[in-house]
């Protein structure tokens, strides 16, 4: 629980809400500007492919924020002398709760959160440093 609290504090301290909103607005504005142009580029931007591109930008940015908040949470645990292995354990439980299923490449790319198993592995590696 302490690791999750540290993770969530990380979102606040790292300004993720504002930067996520800014990225979403910029991606949307960019796609709409491209869609308003003539030719193949405009047609692609206005199509479902353009929507997919926008979703990809937003989800990858979100995954990056989740990773940096994981790092913040682990540093929080270390700083306060808490068991750093607890974060790995939490992500292993999350992976098990999802049936241990790994999504396909596209599912993983469009997810707002990194794969919990990969997050657990990363936390294990960082805790051992």
State the predicted function of each range.
Residues 1-129:
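A Zn2+-metalloprotease active-site environment signal
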